[in-house]
């Protein structure tokens, strides 16, 4: 009799163990994933022209091509540089068929503007002063149930590495403080000259200033586009997307080298992450 009781007890334990260790249902897995991970697709693009042109800012005739790239790649947010102003942004938003809303930064000492486009209709935009320039930050959610993130669109001085360094330091100070309450991504054209063989480094401190600027960013943020290679003509990697160091996963990282039109000298950089 006792043998039957032992066998019955073992059978009950097996059933209980099978139920306990059974794989969760797909809905449970989905809910768990949504609680622990949020995906985000970002794109940055300097849509201006090469230095030899009379006007190196973005050209209105190129906006349909810019809109086509954005609609095709479907990023959650876009950082743009070298727009001529708010009128140009409104034209671009119209070409995007109401899928995005956006803003341009305040005007600094120059004649061109940074901008951010986002899908989130509830996004807010904040100008960020750095030296005599203005970057622009957007706070938004990639999905309704996702945590808030911040994307900062930046454009550092193209001609003076010391000014780039001062600009970068102020920008990162702001980003570090903001990152205490939300993940921060910094995207744009930093114009860093980090290749020792670059002829413009001869008899200058450009390499030193730019290397220290880049290192300063990497103390708090991760270079998400490093694997994608050059982002501009003449073998330059001067466009970046920096993000938190503790991302769960970095997915697609790509420079869209067939996207440039007219005499653009930059290509868009696309990065997908989970955080």
Pin down the residues of each PLM region.
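Structured beta-strand-rich core segments of catalytic domains in phosphoester-bond hydrolases
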Residues: 77, 81-156
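Extracytoplasmic/secreted proteins, especially bacterial periplasmic and envelope-associated proteins
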Residues: 61, 65-68, 87, 91, ...
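Solvent-exposed loop/turn segments at secondary-structure junctions
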Residues: 47-50, 83-87, 108-111, 123, ...
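Extracellular/periplasmic catalytic domains that process cell-envelope and extracellular macromolecules
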Residues: 34-37, 71-72, 94-98, 108-110, ...
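N-terminal, active-site-proximal structural segment of metallo-dependent hydrolase catalytic domains
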Residues: 2-95, 275
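Short aromatic-enriched loop/helix-cap "lid" or pocket-rim segments at secondary-structure transitions
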Residues: 53-57, 91-92, 163-166, 196-202
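Metal-dependent phosphoester-hydrolase catalytic domains
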Residues: 4-8, 17-31, 130, 139, ...
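Active-site beta-strand/loop signature of hydrolases that rely on acidic residues for catalysis
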Residues: 40-47, 66-89, 138, 150-154, ...
């Amino acid at each position: 009799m006792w043998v039957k009781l032992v066998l019955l007890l073992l059978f009950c334990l097996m059933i209980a163990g099978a139920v306990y260790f059974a794989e969760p249902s797909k809905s449970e897995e989905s809910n768990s994933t949504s609680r622990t991970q949020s995906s985000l697709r970002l794109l940055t693009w300097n849509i201006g022209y090469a230095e030899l042109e009379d006007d190196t800012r973005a050209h209105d005739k190129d906006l349909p091509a810019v809109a086509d790239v954005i609609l095709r790649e479907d990023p959650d947010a876009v950082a743009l540089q070298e727009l001529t102003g708010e009128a140009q942004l409104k034209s671009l938003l119209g070409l995007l068929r109401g899928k995005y809303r956006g803003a341009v930064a305040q005007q600094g000492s120059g004649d061109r503007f940074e901008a951010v486009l986002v899908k989130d209709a509830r996004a807010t935009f904040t100008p960020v002063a750095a030296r005599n320039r203005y970057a622009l930050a957007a706070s938004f959610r990639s999905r309704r149930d996702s945590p808030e993130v911040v994307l900062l669109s930046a454009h550092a001085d193209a001609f003076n590495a010391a000014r780039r360094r001062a600009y970068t330091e102020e920008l990162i100070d702001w980003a570090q403080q903001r990152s205490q309450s939300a993940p921060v991504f910094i995207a744009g054209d930093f114009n860093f000259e980090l290749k020792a063989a670059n002829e413009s480094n001869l008899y200058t401190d450009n390499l030193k200033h730019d290397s220290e600027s880049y290192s300063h960013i990497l103390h708090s943020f991760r270079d998400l586009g490093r694997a994608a290679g050059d982002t501009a003509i003449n073998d330059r990697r001067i466009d970046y997307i920096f993000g938190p160091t503790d991302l769960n996963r970095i997915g697609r990282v790509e420079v869209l080298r067939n996207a440039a039109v007219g005499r653009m000298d930059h290509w868009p950089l696309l990065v997908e992450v989970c955080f």
